[in-house]
């Protein structure tokens, strides 16, 4: 039974038992930055189990894409070395939310395994928590499993309820016993049953875990029964497939064998048992699905984990002899295997391929040099009888050549060595400290504040009359008084000043009363709900307890709001034009522009830019109102509000409806889309692999930009004696004229060079049977120099020639050597002899080479030395 059929039978079985088939959630958990990746089927149902996310069903079943690489759950270092560890795997699960409990969960599992999958009953063993008599009795008395194959597992992890068979969501909250089902591969395989000293062997393999959420644990450790008891089960598809296909390694199942064969094809390796092929086959699944879910290779967080996995796969390909990009070629094979079950993979095939290719090409630029350094260092350690690689060197490989630590550790492991990780960590810490010392960090960092939070009025007001000073800071320390001329941070109890957040810059403005004036240059958060006003006291003395009028720079705020609102419209438009894979990766919104970074792996075309501009400007013309609502996070997301992956939102969120856009946002915005005025994209470019950046302007800035552009068009039209509407046609005509003139000029140069070549041939000097010529060819370009050298070689038959030309203070050099002389005189060496004397360098083939220089004054002397240089070699 193939993996695809196993997956399908699982889902259909539970659908027949009243379960709703729920699509796999993203590998990037929504609204939970504490979890690096989705690593089990229950992640998407966490809030359902907690009772905060009601669903229209009480039974669900899923085939959940999962990743265990990075963060608390990390199997990456074991991938390729064991039979059952994967960076990516599929978790089959069925769930009950206050519906059925132990009886049905156990009976469903037994029926599926023994009736649908037809596993022999005598091959199945089960474990239960030692105190879970109910589950024990169901297995023994109702299902009929012999008691010798039912094993009670106690608290085997050093504390009460700390057991392999007792599950907890955390220190407090839902928890309960679980029962696990094992498959016995038979006495020919080493290992003992669960709970025995030999349980880590491969004979008894866990295939399914049924968790019974039965209790709620409070902070004191007290257990009370939940009013609604639930079930969460998980069974690894790969493990189940190995059992059903009668193999002992997950890498021997059909799905992996097809990917391993594909990896062998692109790496040109015939040994299908090679561990590197297993790594590559596993990693193409993890990398592809992470990219499908919006993760892009980067230097931090999830992006860095993806980069580590890609580079680990590349290193294994390099180990197999690949010196160029190969990994991305496996995406099509993965789509063939899993595209039907996961249509989102097929839809994103080209994007995934492009992102992986770009990341590969980037790493292949440095891997060879880095590997040579690493191999040399390991050889040196081995020669000294050592077993540990210097952590400083590992850090150099990380910092200079892009080698993640686990990649270096992987190579060491293959040689029976380890990395000095504490020394690596020390080197990393030193670099971070140096970066911190060199950088200019905001003064709010490290400020100690324990007072009340600031009440923000900036959504409705631009000024607040009775703002009380509750804290003052100078040079990072709390003070009671600030004097004129001092820079300080002021914390108020109430303020209209927006603190930098969500990409929007902080407000500027003034804090003042009759005797005092404090100019606010920036506004930043001291803590989550505490706002710091950074600036300079221009007049008077400011004390804690003083009352001030706080007034923002209204014009600057208005321009910033226009840009922020335009960013929302642009984000939506980009998704419409480029696709739903577009996700915000960063932004900066200030009074001058909006800068927006997003996931997309190709430059935008002119047409795509125009379409985005048109969509946004149509929304502006519609003059739709901006509607702000505060609601529960889950309600907002269900209502279509766009939330940014990786951001942590509170239970209550602020939702902005602006035209066709709906996003979670705490920033300030225009009242109507028409307030934006005009939207214009002025810059589009790449900032990293798979990340594009757009800069745009709005309002009066956009009007000025268009007017200035119009003026330049008129100037260009006048210079070409054309109307602005005829400019494109006129430029094309001029380009044709230039092309024609360049062709004529080239012909004249060739003719001149030919005639000069005849004259130059007469200047050649014979040295040991070889004609040597070094001369300047006035007015020649590189092409003409090359053609002339070829003609002279034909004419002189046996020759070593250097020709030079000077234009605009730069020297061009071409050297040519006939085949009979090139064994002793190399054109590359000859041209470099001259180039080094004129401030340049070059290279090429033994028979033809070129170079350049920047010191034409030295050229005559350099050419004069050619004859002697050739004589020495002949």
Swiss-Prot record:
Entries under Pfam families matching the protein: DHHA1, tRNA-synt_2c, tRNA_SAD
Keyword set includes Translocase: no
Top-tier EC class: ligase
Principal cellular location given in the protein's record: cytoplasm
Co-factor binding comment: Binds 1 zinc ion per subunit.
GO molecular function, one term: alanine-tRNA ligase activity
GO BP: alanyl-tRNA aminoacylation; negative regulation of DNA-templated transcription
Binding-site list for Zn(2+): 564, 568, 665, 669
GO CC annotations on file: cytosol
Subcellular location: Cytoplasm
Catalysis: reaction(s): tRNA(Ala) + L-alanine + ATP = L-alanyl-tRNA(Ala) + AMP + diphosphate
Family membership: Belongs to the class-II aminoacyl-tRNA synthetase family.
Function: Catalyzes the attachment of alanine to tRNA(Ala) in a two-step reaction: alanine is first activated by ATP to form Ala-AMP and then transferred to the acceptor end of tRNA(Ala). Also edits incorrectly charged Ser-tRNA(Ala) and Gly-tRNA(Ala) via its editing domain.
Protein name: Alanine--tRNA ligase
Organism of provenance: Burkholderia orbicola (strain AU 1054)
